Curated annotation (Swiss-Prot):
Keywords from the named record: Ribonucleoprotein, Ribosomal protein, RNA-binding, rRNA-binding
Organism of derivation: Francisella tularensis subsp. holarctica (strain LVS)
Protein encoded by which gene: rplN
InterPro entries noted in UniProt: Ribosomal_uL14 (IPR000218), Ribosomal_uL14_bac-type (IPR005745), Ribosomal_uL14_CS (IPR019972), Ribosomal_uL14_sf (IPR036853)
Job description of the protein: Binds to 23S rRNA. Forms part of two intersubunit bridges in the 70S ribosome.
An annotated Gene Ontology molecular function: large ribosomal subunit rRNA binding
Protein name: Large ribosomal subunit protein uL14
Signal peptide (UniProt feature, chain positions): none
NCBIfam families according to UniProt: rplN_bact
Annotated CDD domains: Ribosomal_uL14
Subunit text: Part of the 50S ribosomal subunit. Forms a cluster with proteins L3 and L19. In the 70S ribosome, L14 and L19 interact and together make contacts with the 16S rRNA in bridges B5 and B8.
SUPFAM superfamilies: Ribosomal protein L14
One Gene Ontology cellular component annotation held by this UniProt entry: cytosolic large ribosomal subunit
Family assignment from sequence similarity: Belongs to the universal ribosomal protein uL14 family.
Domain of life (superkingdom): Bacteria
């Protein structure tokens, strides 16, 4: 469950290391985002030679949450921390690699690129 001011790790090689959620997209008073939701983030910590610079604002898709996601069979998939993948204006990932596992809930038309780049899909 991601809300405003939640800090997330970045799960790609875009150059950002840590981002902060500044808005949950998808409704005027929407409070929480879960896996597969798009949020607006600002870069809080970045590597010196990356594409993403500190202070820049991007859209990002949430790929892992500590809260987890419940499946129809009753099982629940949870992670140790929260992570996101930065997106460009067209909704495509900025990085060319994804680090760590992602969930099957991302298998929509919009995020198939992220699923195909991920080393493991849970």
């Amino acid at each position: 469950m991601i809300q405003m001011q939640t800090e997330l790790q970045v799960a790609d090689n875009s150059g950002a290391k840590r981002v902060e959620c500044i808005k949950v997209l998808g409704g005027s008073h929407r409070r929480y985002a879960s896996i597969g939701d798009v949020i607006k983030v600002t870069v809080k910590e970045a590597s010196p030679r990356g594409k993403a610079k500190k202070g820049s604002v991007y859209n990002a898709v949430v790929v892992r949450t500590a809260k987890g996601v419940r499946r129809k069979d009753g099982s629940k998939v949870r992670f140790d921390g929260n992570a996101a993948v930065l997106l460009n204006a067209n909704g495509q990932p900025i990085g060319t690699r994804i680090f760590g596992p992602v969930t099957r809930e991302l298998r929509t038309e919009k995020f198939m690129k992220i699923v195909s780049l991920a080393p493991e899909v849970l």
